[in-house]
Amino acid sequence: SSAASDVYKRQLFQYPTEKSITRMAKACIKRLQALEDDSLVSAIASQPTDVAKQICLYALMKQSRLVWEFMLTVIGEKYRLRDTSFGKIDLNTFFMRLQEQNDTVASWSDTTITKLKQIIARVLVETEYLDNLKADHLNPVWLHPVLENAIRSNGDMAILPAFNCFS
């Protein structure tokens, strides 16, 4: 698809190979198509990289309840409390709480949980919530109006705190 090749040309995702970039772009576009939001699909190709990354994060959150919950209950709550500290303990606490609340999550192997923690941490770095995997603080994020409008029109206002948006 042209959006996928555009994502590749602009190096939207910092991955070394064209194949992995194209795969990620296609996954993102597939998630967006599931949202049935043409404005966001076209914004991915036309907006600056940081906006496109935010849109991809939102699409991932819509597709993955786990990511939605993490972004809302951990990241959103930290922004709400103006607590910029962040570390492995935040990921560990989140997964421990989930394991206590949910039998399915409780049945997951340690390997699976570790992999999910790595994925979430990488997503936070790619979307510039964190400077790198060793970062000990959250960066302030600014929700782009294109995405904010889409979130509101999709009735997803509950997720706005994950984007440091409280208005």
Where are these predicted regions, by residue range?
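Short, small-residue-biased leader/transition segments that mark boundaries at the very start
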Residues: S1-Y8
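Hydrophobic, aromatic-lined core segments that form the binding pocket/scaffold
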Residues: Q11-L12, P16-I29, A52-Q54
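Basic amphipathic alpha-helical segments that dock to polyanions
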Residues: T22, K26-L35, Q118-T127
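Short acidic alpha-helical/loop segments enriched in Asp/Glu that coordinate divalent cations
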Residues: V41-I44, L81-K88, D103-W108
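Positively charged, polyanion-binding regions of nucleic-acid-associated proteins
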Residues: I55-Y58, K62-T84
